[in-house]
Design a protein with these regions (language model features):
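Glycine-rich, acidic/polar active-site loops that bind/position phosphate-bearing ligands
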Residues: 1-183
Length: 183
């Protein structure tokens, strides 16, 4: 069942067909939740956390990927040069994510050749996980439209840097007060 609250539209290129992504919940033919639907499982866990402890999860994901098809300069890892090589691509990713309501914060080079990371603002509950999926699909779409290929595959070679995802979580109560903050 499509969830219109988990939708994103990419309409950045006027001469190309827009990309409209809507995440969905898996259901059985009778309409009951499918037992292996990850969104339903997460929703149930978040509901239990809220009901039992009055807590909600705020999450953000740092997602690393390799951009195949981009000119690379060996040894430019984490550098301004690596950033400049992907400046147009990075600007497009940020613009498209912003237009799609994903609240991007950073696009930056990582440790591997032609490896980059994209980060968005934290989101509450299921929206945080949905955002992680939507961001990946938008990055892939922007890469494809630029004649490149973005891969989030963890290990793409026997040696070198792998892609990772850093998940930042915090808990807050129903009043929005942080519960994991320790001054």
């Amino acid at each position: 069942v499509p969830d219109l609250s988990a939708a994103a539209r990419v309409d950045h290129w006027p001469d190309q067909t827009p990309f409209h992504l809507i995440l969905s919940d898996g259901v059985n033919p009778d309409g009951s939740p499918w037992m292996a639907c990850l969104r339903a499982l997460l929703r149930n866990a978040l509901d239990a956390l809220r009901e039992e402890f009055d807590l909600s999860v705020l999450s953000a994901f740092e997602q690393e990927f390799y951009l195949n098809g981009l000119t690379d300069l060996p040894g430019a890892n984490y550098s301004l040069i690596a950033h400049q090589l992907a400046a147009d691509f990075g600007a497009q990713v940020i613009a498209v994510l912003r237009a799609a309501g994903q609240e991007p914060e950073t696009f930056e080079p990582e440790g591997g050749p032609a490896q980059y990371e994209v980060n968005c603002r934290p989101a509450l509950g299921l929206r945080g996980a949905d955002r992680a999926l939507i961001v990946r699909e938008i990055v892939r779409d922007v890469a494809r439209r630029n004649g490149c290929r973005a891969t989030f595959t963890p290990v793409i070679a026997e040696v070198g840097f792998s892609n990772g995802v850093h998940v930042h979580l915090s808990l807050q109560d129903s009043a929005g007060r942080p519960r994991t903050y320790d001054p």
